[in-house]
Amino acid sequence: MSMKRLGSLGALLLLWGCGTDAPLPVEPLAEEYCAACSGIASCERLVTDALTVVCPDETEAYYQCVTDNSCDETRCSDQWAAREVCMGNAPRDKVRVQLDGLRPAANLGHRGSGETDPDNPFPESSLNGFTAAIIAGADGVELDVQITADNRPIVIHDDTLDRTTNCTGCVNQMTFDELRLCRLLDGEGNITDQKLPALLEVYTVVSGDSLVNIEIKTFGDDCASDTVSIETMVVELLDGIETIGVAERTILSSLDESVVELIKRERPGYYSALISETPGSALIERAVELAQDAIHPSYEISADDVQSALDAGLQVNVWVVNGAELMQQQIDKGVTGIITDEPEVLAELLTEQP
């Protein structure tokens, strides 16, 4: 284990009151690990305490993995992630805490500053639109990703290019580089200088603690393909999020149950949510069965169902909510987050709450 990870374990153990009384007998695995992988004098004591106090099964699996792999921690990331989940220190836990800290509700800009429309000066899903949402007071943005012909995620809502760009055809039938040659249209149908964003570009403009809600799309019948794989895209998306280090401010969501199942299988510590156009008890039950962190229902969800979801340990982020009156209704229901085309209206309304 690295000095950083072992040091963090020691700090946690001291915080929890471990290491202050008579020491526990040294665990054989602690002896084996410390002899091979650490020169810290207190290593055996810290590892023994961790093995017996802090998520012992997950901790043992991690130390055993590192020891068995000649102290190469990089080969034990799954075991470390499982331990973080057990400890409540996974990215999903930090997202949950951040959302709860934004009460009475988090303000998430839908496709940035809203859908492409004559009244919206920015194209939907554009870097300018995402930037505008944050400037308007949004706590984060909601966006959609589709899969390209070379199995890469790209930011666009539709599975075709016709409505929002100067290109035509299915997104999944063009490569990432080909799609980057397309330009987004404004609400009047004029060609802008805005490209379809890469995910890293969005995180660059939506920076700091701002949240990014990624809805993972699956293509419709008109764009069905045997050459591209949703599973491949999801795995690449998850790897990309991990590589750039933004999981602690990322919400992953999908209408497709197989997608959110895959997310939890590949990254159980990431925050994910099941979307539904039909709110109700069945959605809540299914989200719990799928070990989701939240539901993303339409705003028609009842106050009783919001409370039932919260009682079940789920957060509730509703969509797409426009107009101050409808926004206030969602706040009164107790929802966790509101996805809106009008982040500036919601930002002002939230400042007026008691």
Go through the PLM ranges and name each one.
Residues 15-17:
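C-terminal motif of bacterial Sec signal peptides marking the signal peptidase cleavage site
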Residues 2-12:
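Sec-dependent signal peptide recognition
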Residues 20, 88-354:
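Phosphate-group recognition and catalysis centered on beta-loop-alpha active-site segments
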Residues 5-6, 59, 173-176:
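Alpha-helix initiation and N-capping motif
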Residues 19-91:
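Mature extracellular/luminal domains of secreted and GPI-anchored eukaryotic proteins, especially small
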